Amino acid sequence: MANSGVQLLGFGLSLIGIIGLIVGTILPQWKMSAYVGDSIITAVATYQGLWMSCAFQSTGQLQCKIYDSILQLDSDLQATRALMIVGIIVSIAGLGVASIGMKCTTCGADDKVRKTRTAMTGGIILLVGALCAVVACSWFAHNVIRAFYNPFTPVNTKFEFGAAIFIAWGGSFLDVLGGAMLAASCPRSKQVSKYPKSNSTRSANGSNKEYV
């Protein structure tokens, strides 16, 4: 059977990873204004996220505006949104399934093999959710890099990575690690001897008992 310590570690890493995914999805700092070129204006820092854009003044004032219409957003941002939401939902579902199959829980404790397989299934679901988040973060980062090095992009509209995308990346990788630990909870099949006990051995044992 699987080691309960490994299962607990995988569960903890997955839980922290899911929290990181949620926090990273909510925060607006997915990309921030890049200070490049000769004329650099540092009075205002612009942040853009999946749900809103913010402007941070040098005076310490922060103004945020939620995106009004989904249809006005580009397809890349909508795809990133969808993948992050799917990744979070699938990861939470996988964590719930894995918690049922962990050795430290009492649910279904009568069947040890089925319980371990349940934990393994939860780990696989977690890996699927983490993969969605990794693809979303990587695709968003690819678009930021492509726009940054595009010579036709105005200097004042160039962006670089913000803190939120790194939080989401870290959460997804923790989710992958935790899901892999839970998915490794594969039950070992019991080894059955291929050769039954011979009749001669049984008769010899019986004759020995008679002489005792």
UniProtKB/Swiss-Prot annotation:
GO BP terms: namely: bicellular tight junction assembly; cell adhesion; head development
Q: Classify the source by domain of life.
A: Eukaryota
| InterPro entries, sorted | Claudin, Claudin_CS, PMP22/EMP/MP20/Claudin
Q: Enumerate the GO terms in the molecular function aspect.
A: structural molecule activity
Where in the cell? Cell junction, Tight junction; Cell membrane
Keyword Glycoprotein set for record: no
The topology of this chain with respect to the membrane is: Multi-pass membrane protein
Q: Which residue intervals make up region (Disordered)?
A: 191-212
Q: Which UniProt keywords apply?
A: Cell junction, Cell membrane, Membrane, Tight junction, Transmembrane, Transmembrane helix
Ranges of the Extracellular topological domain = 29-81, 141-162
GO annotations of cellular component type: bicellular tight junction; plasma membrane
Q: Which residues lie on this side of the membrane: Cytoplasmic?
A: 1-7, 103-119, 184-212
Q: Which residues cross the membrane?
A: 8-28, 82-102, 120-140, 163-183
Q: What family does this belong to?
A: Belongs to the claudin family.
Q: What role does this protein play?
A: Plays a major role in tight junction-specific obliteration of the intercellular space.
State the protein's name.
Answer: Claudin-7-A
What is the organism field in this record? Danio rerio
Q: Which gene encodes it?
A: cldn7a
